């Protein structure tokens, strides 16, 4: 039984010969710094890995395999979740899989909980540059009624030559704060 979720790409690895963790981290950091999408980063990870892209099967005995997936990717493609450790699956193996949770289910659960009086779940999956996505969200909010608006997604960021600290979510939040600076009631 496997449980594979978002983040598995970073936590689970057996590198191809000639690669070290330090080299992989440097290659990943370079891609992240240049605004690469998670799909582009995971494509690189699959090329450099002995287990991603369905290659984990070579280390699994002939027993039946079940896989539960928690998706953090747009479209819930199992070959993308965790860089597809078990996908594509061999056709001659006893294999079952199911997506047990995803971004939309989490957002719907938040809305159904009614913890806050007015929660609006936005269907747009934020996947552009963090600063552009923040501006787009702020522009949208300027014309909306009072309430809580929730988006899901995974943005990108292009780092300057001398980057500061933080990550994509912090960059998004700070860009939104700057865009909201002269706006009232948001």
Model-derived features: where do they sit?
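N-terminal loops that bind phosphate or other acidic moieties
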Residues: 1-151, 155-186
